[in-house]
Amino acid sequence: MDLAWNLRLLAQCARSVLHNRQTIPRRILLVGVRARRHHARCMEILTRAQAHRDGTSDAQLQRAVRRGELHRIAAGIYMRADHFRELDARARHRCAVMVATESCGPGAIVSHASAAVMHGLDCGGLRLDTVHMTRNRCSGGRKSQTLHLHPAVVPAEEVVLIDGVATTSLARTFVDLARTTPFETAVVIGDCALRRGMRRENVDASLDHARGRLGMSRARVAATFIEPGAESPGESISRVRMRDDGWPMPTLQHEIRHGGRFIGRVDFFWKEHGVVGEFDGMVKYRGDNPGRAVEREKLREDAIRDAGFEVFRWVWADLRDFERVHERFERACLRGAAR
C-alpha cells in the first residue's frame, strides 16, 4: 500500500511540475534525497556523517559548539553559529524542517504551519517552534516539543514537492490551518495563499477530503471569507475586524478614476457611502525618502477626494483598538452623505 501510494505521489508531483506550476514556488524544484542534500548545502547545514567524511571527529565538533563556532540544530546536525544567528524565525524553521524530513524518513509530508513556511505564506500568527509533519495513515501520530507528527489521509493530489521535500499543497495547507488555528490567522493564510495561486476549486476538494475532521465548520467559514484582494496581513486582519463588528463589507483594491484619468487603486472601497479606506498607506511608497513619500500620499489622497470620495486611514497600532477605526469610518460616511 505504501509503495503504491508513493508511486502515485511521484506521478502526481511530476504532473504538477508539468501542468500546474502555480502550486509550486518558482524557486529551485528538485526531487528526492539528492535535492534535500543540495538544499542543505545551500543552507550551509553540516551533518555528523559529512564531518566524519571530511576527517572531523565528534570531539572536534563538540569543541566547535562549545567555542561558539558551530550551532547544533539537532542531534548530528550543525550550522555555522554566525550564519544561524542571522536567520529569521522562518529560515530557522526551514532548517528544522529539513532535519525533520531526514529523521521521519519516507512517507512523511511537511504540513500545517511548516507547510505554510515552505510555501512562503504570511506566518505572523503561527507558532514556529514545532515542525509539523503528516503521515498518510489513520492513526499513529505523536507529539514532542519540537515535532508534531499528524496521522491523516493525504491524497496524492494534495502533495507537491518544494525543494525536493513532499509538502501539502496550498489548498490542503490552508484547510489544515483553518481547522486548527484562530479564524483571523486562517484568513491571513488563506488570503496570502490565494495571492500565490491557490484555486478555490482545490480548496473545495480539500474541504471535501477533510470531512468529519475536527474544526471543519470554521474551516468552511474561513474558505468563504478569504479574498486575494487583501494584499497584506494587516488588510486581512482589518477585514476580520470589520466582519466581527458588523461593518458593511468593502470592495477590495478598487480602481479610482476621475475625468478618464487613473487616480489609484485603494485598499477598501464602500461605493454606497462614497468612502475609501486605506491601511498603512505609506507602504505603497516604500523605497522613497520619507518626505517625498508623504508628499505623494497627500497628492494621491487629494485626487481621491477631488473624485468625490471621502478617505480615512489606519495603521497597525489601530488594530489593537478597532473601535477607533470604526469611528473614523462613520465620520467619513457622514461627510460623504453631506457632499
Listing of model-derived features with the role each one plays in the protein:
Residues N6, L10-V33, R37-H39, Q50, ...:
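Surface segments flanking catalytic/ligand-binding clefts of nucleic-acid enzymes
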Residues M1-G215, L334-R339:
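Short gly/ser-rich loop at a beta-strand->alpha-helix junction or flexible surface loop bordering the NTP-binding
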